[in-house]
Amino acid sequence: MAAHHRQNTAGRRKVQVSYVIRDEVEKYNRNGVNALQLDPALNRLFTAGRDSIIRIWSVNQHKQDPYIASMEHHTDWVNDVVLCCNGKTLISASSDTTVKVWNAHKGFCMSTLRTHKDYVKALAYAKDKELVASAGLDRQIFLWDVNTLTALTASNNTVTTSSLSGNKDSIYSLAMNQLGTIIVSGSTEKVLRVWDPRTCAKLMKLKGHTDNVKALLLHRDGTQCLSGSSDGTIRLWSLGQQRCIATYRVHDEGVWALQVNDAFTHVYSGGRDRKIYCTDLRNPDIRVLICEEKAPVLKMELDRSADPPPAIWVATTKSTVNKWTLKGIHNFRASGDYDNDCTNPITPLCTQPDQVIKGGASIIQCHILNDKRHILTKDTNNNVAYWDVLKACKVEDLGKVDFEDEIKKRFKMVYVPNWFSVDLKTGMLTITLDESDCFAAWVSAKDAGFSSPDGSDPKLNLGGLLLQALLEYWPRTHVTPMDEEENEVNHVSGGQESRVQKGNGYFQVPPHTPVIFGEAGGRTLFRLLCRDSGGETEAMLLNETVPQWVIDITVDKNMPKFNKIPFYLQPHASSGAKTLKKDRLSASDMLQVRKVMEHVYEKIINLDNESQTTSSSNNEKPEQEKEEDIAVLAEEKIELLCQDQVLDPNMDLRTVKHFIWKSGGDLTLHYRQKST
């Protein structure tokens, strides 16, 4: 298995380009938090979640701002993390199908493991052996020697992995004991499968759950296992007896997260019902409701700085992470004020968290405006914002306003083809460009708010401009005057202008913008920040990864062709004119109605009375004046109609077809002379 090694898949697989519109520093979790790890030696908490970012926080309560740093390299949800090597190394598993190895103290990614073929959902760690296991939706379990992973370098970048086979369904949970002698997996198969990681031998299959197994814990010696399931139960298994020895019905809904004390006598559980219980494994009737969260619980992490544990950290589908005290739990038990019937409401031990790591808002709704450049979004705090896809930035925070009203307010009778797609999975705007439609949208420079140095109004391709901006730091895209002598360069505007500057000559995207090259279907090939494409390593990886359709526009400057639209032009029934032979015409879909009116005036109406309207003085007029005269006369004398609706001369053909024609077949336009 090659770590950080990418084969040149760009030529064989369909590759898309994505980028994320965001702030340079995303200080707060922007979505649900899937994973937690506590480093008691440094008083640090690692959170990893659905916004793709791993963050490091100080758990020192005296610090006003707990944020320390972000660890960014993943491109999709981070589903699990484990701290290894006494807190020096962090391993992460993600829905981008990779496992990453991080320097936890310095916060940088050391290597990437690409063995999995689908979402990686769970990790397990054997502390005494420095062994990590990873598993996911591809039904595979891989074993990794952490010391080997941390020794990987650019020249020594291969690592051997063992795999455990036999799972028939997607794996959602994984556990390994500290000694590294037992590994257990839980899946949608509803069974627990058990192996010996030393020999990769299958040991047993444990049946009992009736739904997905979402959480697993193993006793240090590997003799007992705890499982939490979407069926709402917690089960205690004896691996020696190969059977379930106790079932705990504590929760009203699915159990998604478990923690256990070092003595393996008390289990802490949370899940869909938002409640966190502590249950005595020896006396199942004794369970204490510790607290109730505001959202379903995804992960918990015990503070093991003392015995019994003084606190528990809790992550949910919301972005805030809470620390709840456990200090009164023994008095609570001793008083007998515990729940022995989970159907009866009881008072939780804690009503307020001891410490809060505040989260940020997640974008949950978006609307692409008609200009196919701007987007309106609404977040979990009901704040509405206005974004520019082309410049990859937020234009304005609109606050708590009515989302639908803002959409109506910004509606324009203009049609631009779709040229990108939007994904909100991480809680931020991720824009994806695909070869099939990236170059579909042409607009005039004037309509896009750009001015040309020569005062002209060239046609611009939005997808082409954006790709040039995203890769403007990549030296391969830079053109020098010497290159221009050898190659005739077509600018994105279609002009033959000298292009010595980087980018597209109109705008730049923020240099911190993450750019992602990935296979259609989600597998990431390469992620980098826009500004880093000038680096030697990054430039080399771009050479291997950037697909030909992007090379064509950014390196070779080959512009896509204009979109053509076929249409028919006929006299209106009210004009009394003879119907013409039905010729099928074709023009750029951006052609304005006024240009068709000029064509009608000059080539059709004027032909009948050309001898009367042409004079010697007119013949002597400069060509430009003639054109201006025709434009004015056409607008004064001609009307163009579609579906019996008089058309605005400023409208273009694609807008007419989309908003007025609205039917299959070729567009049909009718003309008539205005009544005087």
From Swiss-Prot:
Subcellular location: Nucleus; Cytoplasm; Lysosome; Late endosome
One Gene Ontology biological process: positive regulation of double-strand break repair via homologous recombination
Example GO molecular function: DNA binding
Gene3D superfamilies xrefs: YVTN repeat-like/Quinoprotein amine dehydrogenase
Keywords: Acetylation, Cytoplasm, DNA damage, DNA repair, DNA-binding, Endosome, Lysosome, Nucleus, Phosphoprotein, Repeat, Ubl conjugation pathway, WD repeat
Low complexity bias spans: 609-619
Pfam families: DUF3337, WD40
Primary location: nucleus
Residue positions where Phosphothreonine is found in the record: T613
Region described as Disordered: spans on this chain: 607-628
Source organism, top-level taxon: Eukaryota
Modified residues (N6-acetyllysine): K214, K578
Entry-annotated residues carrying Phosphotyrosine: Y28
Subunit structure: Interacts with USP46. Interacts with USP1. Interacts with USP12. Component of the USP12-WDR20-WDR48 deubiquitinating complex. Component of the USP12-DMWD-WDR48 deubiquitinating complex. Interacts with PHLPP1. Interacts with RAD51AP1; the interaction is direct and promotes formation of a trimeric complex with RAD51 via RAD51AP1. Interacts with ATAD5; the interaction regulates USP1-mediated PCNA deubiquitination. Interacts with RAD51; the interaction is enhanced under replication stress.
Domains: entry comment: The WD repeats are required for the interaction with deubiquitinating enzymes USP1, USP12 and USP46.
UniProt name for this protein: WD repeat-containing protein 48
